[in-house]
């Protein structure tokens, strides 16, 4: 039993929630933090590349940031970038990262979001894992035996609208024109980001934990139901 070092925590410590690629100096700071974490006893590196600020990494950026692990038996465990319409591309991305670095890969909470992705997609996923194993990649995954997933409500937003941290997000949501732009994106299927709104619908997205006292009575209700009580469009 042990701990993993969080790649997102490391990146946030180096660059905060600022958008864009890491500079060379920032990459070296990330390497130092990774090496220090491993020296302190971390058993591997945990990634959440669907989430801020890690979604700022592209595939090559991940390979660069994880160079201290190259050729070791130190694993990466990752929430993939997209568990919906783009799940196969998202899996190919992390498999290719592990393969280039020659390190073990564990995919966290393997699932297909959206009923339209339940049919042949799981078969294709298993084929990807089998093909990777045949090439010598050490790869596995975990899953939970129920249909409900969980995440932060902010993760419903497209990645470009999450940049800059909480204050920047709140400023965007307070702007009617920005909300209109967000709504337009959320109403379209995407293999670029995990569009949970389009995949599940507001009637299947529930608020489970609300920290503000005046809103706590809405815990356990769907976003669609909450919006109805406020007389508002769920997208707002």
Model-predicted segments: where are they?
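Mobile "lid/hinge" segments at catalytic clefts and subdomain interfaces of large enzymes
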Residues: 2-8
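Active-site neighborhoods of metal-dependent hydrolases
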Residues: 4, 13, 17-24, 30-51, ...
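Short active-site-adjacent helix-start/loop capping segments
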Residues: 11-12, 86
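Short, amphipathic alpha-helical segments
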Residues: 24-28, 56-59, 88, 119
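Divalent metal-binding pocket/active-site signature
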Residues: 36-93
């Amino acid at each position: 039993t042990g701990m993993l070092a969080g790649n997102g925590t490391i990146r946030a410590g180096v660059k905060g929630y600022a958008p864009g690629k890491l500079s060379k100096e920032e990459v070296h700071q990330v390497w130092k933090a990774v090496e220090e974490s491993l020296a302190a006893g971390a058993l591997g590196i945990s990634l959440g590349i669907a989430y801020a600020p890690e979604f700022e990494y592209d595939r090559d950026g991940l390979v660069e940031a994880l160079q201290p692990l190259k050729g070791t038996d130190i694993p990466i465990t990752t929430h993939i970038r997209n568990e919906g319409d783009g799940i196969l591309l998202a899996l190919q991305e992390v498999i290719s990262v592990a393969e280039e670095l020659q390190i073990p890969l564990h995919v966290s909470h393997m699932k297909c979001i959206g009923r339209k992705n339940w049919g042949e997609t799981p078969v294709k996923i298993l084929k990807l894992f089998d093909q990777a194993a045949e090439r010598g990649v050490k790869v596995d995954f975990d899953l939970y035996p129920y249909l409900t997933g969980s995440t932060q409500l902010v993760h419903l937003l497209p990645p470009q609208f999450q940049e800059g941290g909480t204050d920047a997000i709140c400023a965007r949501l307070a702007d009617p024109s920005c909300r209109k732009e967000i709504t337009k994106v959320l109403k379209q299927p995407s293999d670029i980001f995990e569009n949970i709104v389009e995949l599940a619908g507001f009637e299947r997205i529930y608020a489970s934990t609300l920290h503000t006292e005046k809103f706590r009575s809405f815990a356990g209700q769907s976003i669609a139901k909450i919006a109805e009580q406020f007389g508002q469009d769920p997208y707002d």
